[in-house]
Amino acid sequence: MKPDLPPRIAVLLVNLGTPDEPTAPAVRRYLKQFLSDPRVIEIPKFLWAIILNLFVLPSRPKRVAEAYASIWDGDSPMRNILNTQVEMLDKRLAERAAPFRVSVHAAMSYGNPGLPDVMDKLRSEGVDHFVMLPVFPQYSATSTGAVYDAMTKWSLKQRNLPNMTIVKDYFAHPLYIKALADSIRRFQAIHGKPEKLMFSFHGIPQPYADKGDPYPKRCKCTAAQVAHELGLKPDEWIISFQSRFGKQEWIKPYTDVVLEDWGKSGIRSVQILSPAFSADCLETLEELAIENRETFLKAGGEEYHYIPALNADEAHIDLLEAMSAPLVKGWAGTLDGWA
């Protein structure tokens, strides 16, 4: 007879974050937290505080809030999708571990629900092992690195530390590559094949890459493996980088610049996806699906389609389960009965 144990193992799906509502004050709070992280902005703290508070925060929140409002559906798409991913993965792990109770929870690096708050709550409920799964397929110090930082800062305040395990990234995981390739195949079965397929990843400043951030190489590896899985020729696809911020040089080529060049050079049809995002968000639904579409069509292009992120696709949950279940099992394996 297996003991009926309380939930002691928690899997945390950690995404970047989102404002609480599509208003300028909420966006300002979110941006201040996000852009104050030295992992994100590597500028001397005193100098950046002046730029952030005198130039960025007085002007940017209103415009960003308007963009969020255009895609808001009761809550931000990222949080809605993350919550669905949590529910689906929780059900799967609960079925495998029954009667041992393994719970899955959402957390954010910035905004709500904040990672430290989630960990505090779960710790008070008796959780003594955390499996951290940042849903950033390609590691960067600006994303997954910030999760490590948050875990470390939280740990410094604990006297009785829990066990903690973290998945660094999964840029070349076979299930991830297959899920991306299959999502493209399904999309093209409906919309046909384009002249060009663009893999657009969120960018980082070039100096970050120069200092050793492996993110660009991981992005290129992901795109190349998916292209290989699809049997694409070298001239049928490209990798690019989006969402640059400020005047600093970012890793290239830039998504919007390539799209404009393609439109002017006679390329008529493009399909674009962003494998860096595990859930659709402002950068995909507004920037890629709307802004960059206008850029391409205005430059002379005729057909432009955005291929959605993996979101709550069953194949995506298969991937999340494949990465988290062995780590949970490794801890629960001392208990008889893990499936």
Curated annotation (Swiss-Prot):
Under Pfam families, the record lists: Ferrochelatase (PF00762)
Subcellular location(s) per record: Cytoplasm
Q: Does the keyword Cell cycle apply?
A: no
Q: Which SUPFAM superfamilies match?
A: Chelatase
Q: In which pathway does it act?
A: Porphyrin-containing compound metabolism; protoheme biosynthesis; protoheme from protoporphyrin-IX: step 1/1
Using the UniProt record, name the top-level EC class of this enzyme in a single word. lyase
- EC nos: 4.98.1.1
Q: Which GO terms describe its biological process?
A: heme biosynthetic process
The record's listing under InterPro entries reads: Ferrochelatase, Ferrochelatase_AS, Ferrochelatase_C, Ferrochelatase_N
A GO molecular-function descriptor: metal ion binding
Per its UniProt record, what CDD domains does this chain match? Ferrochelatase_C, Ferrochelatase_N
Catalytic reaction annotation: heme b + 2 H(+) = protoporphyrin IX + Fe(2+)
Q: Which PANTHER family match?
A: FERROCHELATASE, FERROCHELATASE, MITOCHONDRIAL
Kindly provide the name given to this protein in its UniProt entry. Answer: Ferrochelatase
Recorded source organism is Psychrobacter arcticus (strain DSM 17307 / VKM B-2377 / 273-4)
Tell me the gene name. Answer: hemH
